[in-house]
UniProtKB/Swiss-Prot annotation:
InterPro entries: Shieldin_RINN1. It comes from the Eukaryota. Disulfide bonds: none annotated. This is Shieldin complex subunit 3. It is found in: Chromosome. Keywords: Chromosome, DNA damage, DNA repair. Residues 28-83 are annotated as: Sufficient for interaction with MAD2L2. Residues 108-119 have a biased composition (Polar residues). It comes from Homo sapiens. In BRCA1-deficient cells, function of the shieldin complex is necessary for sensitivity to the PARP inhibitor olaparib. Component of the shieldin complex, which plays an important role in repair of DNA double-stranded breaks (DSBs). During G1 and S phase of the cell cycle, the complex functions downstream of TP53BP1 to promote non-homologous end joining (NHEJ) and suppress DNA end resection. Mediates various NHEJ-dependent processes including immunoglobulin class-switch recombination, and fusion of unprotected telomeres. Residues 108-129 are annotated as: Disordered.
Length: 250
Protein backbone atom coordinates (compact mmCIF):
# COMPACT_ATOMS: atom_id res chain seq x y z
CA UNK A 1 0.00 0.00 0.00
CA UNK A 2 1.43 3.34 -1.05
CA UNK A 3 0.54 6.75 0.26
CA UNK A 4 0.71 9.82 -1.94
CA UNK A 5 1.96 12.88 -0.11
CA UNK A 6 1.82 16.42 -1.47
CA UNK A 7 4.17 18.64 0.49
CA UNK A 8 3.91 22.43 0.31
CA UNK A 9 6.98 24.31 1.46
CA UNK A 10 8.41 27.81 1.42
CA UNK A 11 11.28 28.72 -0.92
CA UNK A 12 13.56 29.14 2.07
CA UNK A 13 12.83 25.53 3.13
CA UNK A 14 13.87 23.88 -0.14
CA UNK A 15 16.63 21.75 1.42
CA UNK A 16 16.34 18.33 -0.35
CA UNK A 17 17.62 16.49 2.71
CA UNK A 18 14.99 17.91 5.07
CA UNK A 19 11.89 17.59 2.87
CA UNK A 20 11.70 13.75 3.01
CA UNK A 21 12.02 13.84 6.79
CA UNK A 22 9.19 16.36 7.03
CA UNK A 23 7.01 14.15 4.81
CA UNK A 24 7.74 11.06 6.92
CA UNK A 25 6.78 12.86 10.11
CA UNK A 26 3.57 14.12 8.49
CA UNK A 27 2.29 10.59 7.70
CA UNK A 28 3.28 9.01 11.00
CA UNK A 29 0.46 7.92 13.29
CA UNK A 30 -0.20 10.09 16.27
CA UNK A 31 1.13 8.52 19.47
CA UNK A 32 -1.57 7.21 21.75
CA UNK A 33 -1.44 6.01 25.31
CA UNK A 34 -3.96 3.88 27.18
CA UNK A 35 -6.11 5.71 29.69
CA UNK A 36 -5.75 4.70 33.29
CA UNK A 37 -8.69 3.14 35.07
CA UNK A 38 -10.88 5.67 36.86
CA UNK A 39 -10.87 5.28 40.61
CA UNK A 40 -13.41 7.40 42.54
CA UNK A 41 -12.15 9.41 45.46
CA UNK A 42 -14.90 8.08 47.77
CA UNK A 43 -15.53 4.44 48.74
CA UNK A 44 -18.08 2.98 46.35
CA UNK A 45 -19.24 -0.63 46.07
CA UNK A 46 -22.20 -0.17 43.72
CA UNK A 47 -24.93 -1.00 46.23
CA UNK A 48 -24.96 2.11 48.38
CA UNK A 49 -25.19 5.75 47.44
CA UNK A 50 -21.91 7.60 47.99
CA UNK A 51 -23.72 10.65 49.44
CA UNK A 52 -26.76 10.61 51.70
CA UNK A 53 -28.87 13.50 52.99
CA UNK A 54 -28.43 14.26 56.63
CA UNK A 55 -32.17 14.37 57.28
CA UNK A 56 -35.01 12.34 55.79
CA UNK A 57 -37.50 14.12 53.50
CA UNK A 58 -40.70 15.53 55.04
CA UNK A 59 -43.78 13.29 55.05
CA UNK A 60 -47.09 14.74 53.81
CA UNK A 61 -50.24 13.10 55.11
CA UNK A 62 -53.12 12.10 52.83
CA UNK A 63 -55.40 14.74 54.41
CA UNK A 64 -52.90 17.52 53.68
CA UNK A 65 -52.52 16.30 50.09
CA UNK A 66 -56.30 16.39 49.58
CA UNK A 67 -56.50 19.94 50.97
CA UNK A 68 -53.84 21.07 48.50
CA UNK A 69 -55.69 19.47 45.57
CA UNK A 70 -58.99 21.15 46.53
CA UNK A 71 -57.29 24.55 46.85
CA UNK A 72 -55.66 24.22 43.42
CA UNK A 73 -58.99 23.21 41.84
CA UNK A 74 -60.82 26.22 43.31
CA UNK A 75 -58.10 28.69 42.25
CA UNK A 76 -58.08 27.35 38.67
CA UNK A 77 -61.88 27.72 38.46
CA UNK A 78 -61.71 31.33 39.67
CA UNK A 79 -59.02 32.17 37.14
CA UNK A 80 -61.09 30.78 34.25
CA UNK A 81 -64.33 32.50 35.31
CA UNK A 82 -62.66 35.92 35.81
CA UNK A 83 -63.21 38.17 32.78
CA UNK A 84 -60.47 40.76 32.35
CA UNK A 85 -61.79 44.13 31.25
CA UNK A 86 -59.12 46.52 30.04
CA UNK A 87 -61.51 49.49 30.11
CA UNK A 88 -61.96 49.49 33.87
CA UNK A 89 -61.16 52.87 35.47
CA UNK A 90 -60.67 54.55 32.08
CA UNK A 91 -62.55 57.86 31.89
CA UNK A 92 -63.25 57.54 28.17
CA UNK A 93 -65.39 54.40 28.72
CA UNK A 94 -67.53 55.69 31.56
CA UNK A 95 -71.02 56.37 30.14
CA UNK A 96 -71.94 58.92 32.81
CA UNK A 97 -68.99 61.17 31.98
CA UNK A 98 -69.68 64.11 29.74
CA UNK A 99 -67.57 64.68 26.66
CA UNK A 100 -67.10 68.34 27.54
CA UNK A 101 -65.43 67.47 30.82
CA UNK A 102 -63.03 65.14 29.03
CA UNK A 103 -62.11 67.82 26.51
CA UNK A 104 -61.53 70.37 29.26
CA UNK A 105 -59.31 68.04 31.28
CA UNK A 106 -57.32 67.10 28.17
CA UNK A 107 -56.79 70.78 27.29
CA UNK A 108 -55.72 71.58 30.84
CA UNK A 109 -53.20 68.75 30.75
CA UNK A 110 -51.76 69.99 27.46
CA UNK A 111 -51.40 73.50 28.86
CA UNK A 112 -49.62 72.16 31.92
CA UNK A 113 -47.25 70.07 29.81
CA UNK A 114 -46.52 72.96 27.46
CA UNK A 115 -45.80 75.20 30.45
CA UNK A 116 -43.36 72.66 31.84
CA UNK A 117 -41.67 72.32 28.46
CA UNK A 118 -41.36 76.11 28.24
CA UNK A 119 -39.71 76.26 31.63
CA UNK A 120 -37.33 73.44 30.69
CA UNK A 121 -36.41 75.17 27.42
CA UNK A 122 -35.73 78.44 29.29
CA UNK A 123 -33.50 76.58 31.72
CA UNK A 124 -31.75 74.90 28.81
CA UNK A 125 -31.12 78.26 27.15
CA UNK A 126 -29.64 79.60 30.37
CA UNK A 127 -27.24 76.68 30.64
CA UNK A 128 -26.31 76.66 26.92
CA UNK A 129 -24.32 79.86 27.09
CA UNK A 130 -21.28 80.03 24.87
CA UNK A 131 -18.18 78.75 26.69
CA UNK A 132 -15.59 78.40 23.88
CA UNK A 133 -14.47 80.67 21.06
CA UNK A 134 -11.94 79.70 18.38
CA UNK A 135 -10.25 81.94 15.80
CA UNK A 136 -9.87 80.88 12.18
CA UNK A 137 -6.37 80.79 10.64
CA UNK A 138 -5.52 84.09 8.98
CA UNK A 139 -2.34 85.76 7.77
CA UNK A 140 -3.60 89.33 8.08
CA UNK A 141 -3.29 89.60 11.86
CA UNK A 142 0.28 88.24 11.92
CA UNK A 143 1.71 91.13 9.88
CA UNK A 144 1.74 93.49 12.87
CA UNK A 145 3.34 91.00 15.26
CA UNK A 146 6.67 92.22 16.65
CA UNK A 147 9.55 89.98 17.79
CA UNK A 148 9.49 88.80 21.37
CA UNK A 149 11.01 91.01 24.04
CA UNK A 150 14.42 90.15 25.47
CA UNK A 151 12.90 89.39 28.87
CA UNK A 152 10.57 86.78 27.42
CA UNK A 153 13.29 85.35 25.19
CA UNK A 154 15.52 84.87 28.23
CA UNK A 155 12.69 83.07 30.05
CA UNK A 156 12.12 80.76 27.09
CA UNK A 157 15.82 80.02 26.85
CA UNK A 158 16.09 79.24 30.57
CA UNK A 159 13.08 76.90 30.45
CA UNK A 160 14.06 75.42 27.06
CA UNK A 161 10.65 76.30 25.60
CA UNK A 162 9.97 76.56 21.87
CA UNK A 163 8.14 79.59 20.52
CA UNK A 164 5.37 77.33 19.18
CA UNK A 165 4.44 76.11 22.67
CA UNK A 166 0.87 76.93 23.67
CA UNK A 167 0.48 79.41 26.51
CA UNK A 168 -2.50 80.84 28.34
CA UNK A 169 -3.37 84.39 29.33
CA UNK A 170 -5.58 84.49 32.43
CA UNK A 171 -8.07 87.33 32.80
CA UNK A 172 -9.35 87.61 36.37
CA UNK A 173 -12.69 89.18 37.19
CA UNK A 174 -10.88 91.60 39.52
CA UNK A 175 -9.19 93.47 36.62
CA UNK A 176 -12.31 94.03 34.50
CA UNK A 177 -12.52 97.77 35.36
CA UNK A 178 -16.16 97.94 36.55
CA UNK A 179 -17.20 95.50 33.82
CA UNK A 180 -18.66 92.07 34.41
CA UNK A 181 -16.91 88.94 33.26
CA UNK A 182 -19.75 88.32 30.79
CA UNK A 183 -19.17 91.77 29.25
CA UNK A 184 -15.49 91.00 28.76
CA UNK A 185 -16.39 87.61 27.31
CA UNK A 186 -18.79 89.18 24.79
CA UNK A 187 -16.16 91.68 23.63
CA UNK A 188 -13.54 88.94 23.37
CA UNK A 189 -15.82 86.83 21.19
CA UNK A 190 -16.25 89.74 18.78
CA UNK A 191 -12.48 90.22 18.57
CA UNK A 192 -11.90 86.52 17.90
CA UNK A 193 -14.68 86.38 15.28
CA UNK A 194 -12.92 89.13 13.32
CA UNK A 195 -9.66 87.10 13.42
CA UNK A 196 -7.75 89.84 15.22
CA UNK A 197 -6.00 87.36 17.54
CA UNK A 198 -3.65 84.93 15.76
CA UNK A 199 -3.87 81.22 16.63
CA UNK A 200 -6.13 81.93 19.61
CA UNK A 201 -8.93 80.07 21.27
CA UNK A 202 -10.60 81.16 24.49
CA UNK A 203 -12.85 79.73 27.17
CA UNK A 204 -14.69 81.25 30.11
CA UNK A 205 -14.45 79.52 33.48
CA UNK A 206 -17.50 80.95 35.20
CA UNK A 207 -17.03 78.91 38.38
CA UNK A 208 -13.51 80.35 38.75
CA UNK A 209 -14.34 83.89 37.65
CA UNK A 210 -11.69 83.72 34.91
CA UNK A 211 -11.30 83.86 31.13
CA UNK A 212 -8.52 81.79 29.56
CA UNK A 213 -7.04 82.89 26.23
CA UNK A 214 -4.73 80.32 24.60
CA UNK A 215 -2.17 81.26 21.95
CA UNK A 216 1.28 80.35 20.65
CA UNK A 217 4.15 81.86 22.64
CA UNK A 218 5.47 83.62 19.53
CA UNK A 219 2.27 85.74 19.48
CA UNK A 220 1.69 86.01 23.24
CA UNK A 221 2.97 89.59 23.73
CA UNK A 222 0.93 90.86 20.79
CA UNK A 223 -2.16 89.05 22.08
CA UNK A 224 -1.61 90.30 25.63
CA UNK A 225 -1.23 93.94 24.55
CA UNK A 226 -4.34 93.74 22.38
CA UNK A 227 -6.36 92.18 25.21
CA UNK A 228 -5.37 94.86 27.72
CA UNK A 229 -6.09 97.68 25.27
CA UNK A 230 -9.31 96.51 23.64
CA UNK A 231 -10.87 95.07 26.79
CA UNK A 232 -9.74 97.99 29.01
CA UNK A 233 -8.16 95.75 31.64
CA UNK A 234 -6.70 97.64 34.60
CA UNK A 235 -4.54 95.03 36.30
CA UNK A 236 -1.84 92.53 35.47
CA UNK A 237 -2.44 89.45 33.32
CA UNK A 238 -0.25 86.38 33.68
CA UNK A 239 1.05 84.04 30.98
CA UNK A 240 0.77 80.41 32.08
CA UNK A 241 2.44 77.38 30.45
CA UNK A 242 1.52 73.83 31.35
CA UNK A 243 4.04 72.15 33.70
CA UNK A 244 5.99 75.43 34.01
CA UNK A 245 3.48 77.78 35.63
CA UNK A 246 3.53 81.56 35.14
CA UNK A 247 6.50 82.52 32.95
CA UNK A 248 5.60 86.10 32.06
CA UNK A 249 3.34 88.94 33.18
CA UNK A 250 2.06 92.07 31.52
Amino acid sequence: MTTEVILHYRPCESDPTQLPKIAEKAIQDFPTRPLSRFIPWFPYDGSKLPLRPKRSPPVISEEAAEDVKQYLTISEHDAKSHSYDCTVDLLEFQPSLKKQHLTWSHTLKEQTNSGNLGKQSEKGKQHKRRSWSISLPSNNCTKNVSPLSKKLQDSLKALNLHSLYRARWTIEHTICNSQTLEDIWTKLNQIIRHNELPSCNATIQRHLGQIWVFCDIMYCEYVGSLLKGRLALTGKINLFVHKYGVIFSM
